[in-house]
């Protein structure tokens, strides 16, 4: 695995496995919402009413709808970090 993907892959994989709703902001400002169904080196497959293939180079930010816990590399499986939470104004 490339050094630059040491955080990206576990983050996306956790979002996929736990079916966490996400907001994906593209570099042109468009906001997409849905669940990550799959991903590879170049694309993320986002599922909502339809499936959308989003190229990673077009993504600015991925914001989970709730806190996500990731195991730290090189530490015990019980050690975890928390990745942000999207604020709701409802």
UniProtKB/Swiss-Prot annotation:
GO CC annotation: cytosol
GO biological process, one term: regulation of DNA-templated transcription
Keyword RNA-binding recorded: yes
Stored SUPFAM superfamilies: Sm-like ribonucleoproteins
Keyword flag Endoplasmic reticulum: no
GO MF assignments: RNA binding
Keyword vocabulary terms for this entry: RNA-binding, Stress response
Domain Sm, residue spans: 9-68
TM stretches of this protein: none
PROSITE patterns associated with the record: SM (PS52002)
InterPro entries: Hfq, LSM_dom_sf, Sm
Function of the protein: RNA chaperone that binds small regulatory RNA (sRNAs) and mRNAs to facilitate mRNA translational regulation in response to envelope stress, environmental stress and changes in metabolite concentrations. Also binds with high specificity to tRNAs.
PANTHER family associated with the record: RNA-BINDING PROTEIN HFQ (PTHR34772:SF1)
Subunit structure: Homohexamer.
NCBIfam families: Hfq (TIGR02383), PRK00395.1 (NF001602)
Similarity comment: Belongs to the Hfq family.
Protein name (Swiss-Prot/TrEMBL): RNA-binding protein Hfq
Organism: Halorhodospira halophila (strain DSM 244 / SL1) (Ectothiorhodospira halophila (strain DSM 244 / SL1))
